[in-house]
Swiss-Prot record:
Keyword RNA-binding recorded: yes
Protein name, as recorded: Potential RNA-dependent RNA polymerase
Task of the protein: RNA-directed RNA polymerase that is involved in both transcription and genome replication.
Name of the coding gene: Segment-2
Taxon lineage: Viruses, Riboviria, Orthornavirae, Pisuviricota, Duplopiviricetes
UniProtKB keywords: Nucleotide-binding, Nucleotidyltransferase, RNA-binding, RNA-directed RNA polymerase, Transferase, Viral RNA replication, Virion
Amino acid sequence: MQVAPNVWSKYFNIPNPGLRAYFSNVVSGQPEVYRTPFYKGMSLESICDEWYKKLVSIDTQWPTLMEFEDDLRKKVGPMSVMLPLKERMSDIDSYYDSISKDQVPFDTKAISAAKSEWKGVSRLRLRSEVNTVAVMKKSTNSGSPYFSKRKAVVSKTIPCDVYMDGRYCVMRQNGREWSGAAVLGWRGQEGGPKPTDVKQRVVWMFPFAVNIRELQVYQPLILTFQRLGLVPAWVSMEAVDRRITKMFDTKGPRDVVVCTDFSKFDQHFNPTCQSVAKELLADLLTGQEAVDWLERVFPIKYAIPLAYNWGEIRYGIHGMGSGSGGTNADETLVHRVLQHEAAISHHTTLNPNSQCLGDDGVLTYPGISAEDVMQSYSRHGLDMNLEKQYVSKQDCTYLRRWHHTDYRVDGMCVGVYSTMRALGRLAMQERYYDPDVWGEKMVTLRYLSIIENVKYHPLKEEFLDFCIKGDKTRLGLGIPGFLDNIAGEAQKAIDMMPDFLGYTKSLQYDGDLRRNAAAGIENWWVVQALKSRR
């Protein structure tokens, strides 16, 4: 809805030419397909065709890995095309409409089972605002009200207090009161070879102050779960591999593993799911400050207004706002309850080596079937498609990696990343990168962060050679001193390139570990393999 200028100025520090220009781009969209210099002059289809000639050799020994590669090849394509606002309104509507589907409460036994898993967590207390801000990424946008770099407005933001008052979000920042709103953002995801295939993702850019108050809980929570190994994906991909291996080694030989697939999990994260997330957090927290936080801060991510154009704001309760500091944690905790409930409804117990992260999950229990899992999950208003659930006794896909009970490295069922997906990421950009900032070192670091994912692929060495041929610097081999000083180069890159490590790896370096996020890059497989080719 349109709001009056005097109302708009309660949400944003006006004048703000950067914000006005931003919304102008949101309205018009972005039609360009941004390519990298990788295999310059060749189409992405031609690059994939050339690599496929080598890739097909895995089909005989690992047919399900070949199927995994073939499936992801269909989705390889542009990522940078943003539709105009008018063509994205239905995606925004979905956040408000999808939470109203029929839903029943969760089984209390399933909630208790999840709580029992986490009983080793000491009663958590809130972090101070100062300590929370110290380990937050401050190179990103601050959102409402200043809409500038976070690092430029820290002193204007803390101390802060935030809470919902009816349909409004109140933000008190360093003695000044504002109304809070998320700003409509965008993320593109490959969906196929044509520009029209780009999947349009709604991003909720949360106010800096709201994120600070949220992360006072979620930072220590994730850190504690990391220390106890409760969510392997928050620890490392190696921890994920170990748990997948245990799952295959402990499940019944006739029992399948179900890899679950939700449609629009954020949008369908309804009041039933939200209340369970709150109950689970209440069980992990202690003290009056935590009680106040649960009443004042926790609900914001499900009710914060959305500024989607200059002078236009949408109000009302909705699904999960993606830019919240608690998006991944709330969804992961609730997803674990869903997994327990599926097993309990079948009168059995979940294999404890089942896993989930956000909407991504893999589970097994005696007598499991995809139909039973889907029926159990859908009771709570969540949307699933039976044809998209992957079922197998021997292999699974989790966090975009293929695992097989017989494909092991040092005894571990390691996760294999698709080389086809990697090619798409190497050739296509998510957004425009300023060439004055993105020199050849930054481009090469981005390439290496993508190629490192394939370190367990049976054709990893052949793939690396293929990639070297497609890059004018030969992946840094042609840049004097680059590989020898790669740790220093990576540290410089992280603030400039927020997704340099990838989303999952960023979660693994959350909290106190973020400052060491580049540590160990010199030991990456791809770096060592390149050095051996000098």
